[in-house]
Structures are given as structure tokens and as C-alpha cells.
Amino acid sequence: GDSATVFDTEFGKIGLCICFDIRFPEIFRRMVLEGADIVLVPAAFNMTTGPAHWELTFRARALDNQIFVFGTSPARDLSASYQAFGHSIAVSPWGRVLNQMDEHEGMQITTIDLDEITSVREQLPLLKTRMENL
């Protein structure tokens, strides 16, 4: 598409992108500028990119934009032709991993406090001090 996907919910403003989009900081910044507090990323990294980049990219996007980022992944199916890395993840605006699963099927519930976004942005005012003129 040619625009960011951000929508209002009873939980806050949520941004949505998919798998490969996590690699582009610009998409996340656009969603944050449109008010996203949370970004959801359904993704299926493989066994090459997953171990190397999964946690790193999710933590970077959360920290860069001081938002909550959630990545969901299929469980690894050893009988399938495509081997997903798994490791669904929840990351805080400080870049801290709140929850991370392994490669198996399962479910975790992560409780978040959207006030943490304000607190983090007061401690480290990245959005207020960004260099828009570059």
C-alpha cells in the first residue's frame, strides 16, 4: 500500500503492518505520527532471519518510536516446507521484551499500561527532539 494503517480501538490507537515491514523504520514513524500507541506485526521469519533479526528488529522499532510492539508468528512445523522461527514477542516503549514465546504453539497474555509511553517519552524525548530538517 501507499499509506500507514492506524485505527482507533477501545484499547488505544493501533497500527498494523506485516512481516517485512518491520525492517523499515519509516513505516513505524509514520504510524506513530498518526497516533499509534501499539503496533501489531503478524510475521513469519524463517530459520535464517529469525535467530539473527527477530528480537533485534522488534526491540529497535519499539524503542525508536517509544511504543508497544507485538509480533506474532506461526509455530514451527517441522513437517512443513517453510520453517517459521516462531518466538511471538511483546516489547515495551523502552525496548524491553515483556514476553517472548518459543517456537511451539501456545498463547501468552501481556498486560500493558499505555501511560508507560508518556513516562518513557518524558525520560527520553526522542520524538520531541527528532531532526525533521535532515
How would you name each of these model-derived features?
Residues 117-134:
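A conserved C-terminal secondary-structure "cap"
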Residues 13, 23-108:
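CN hydrolase (nitrilase-like) catalytic-core segments centered on the catalytic cysteine
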Residues 3-15, 38:
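Beta-strand-turn-beta hairpins that frame and shape the catalytic cleft
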Residues 106-122:
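A short, polar/charged loop-to-alpha-helix boundary motif
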Residues 21-25, 114-117:
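Alpha-helix N-cap/helix-start and coil->helix boundary motif
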Residues 20, 56-58, 118, 127:
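Short alpha-helical segments used as structural interaction elements across diverse proteins
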Residues 4-6, 17, 22, 31:
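Conserved catalytic scaffold of divalent metal-dependent phosphoesterases
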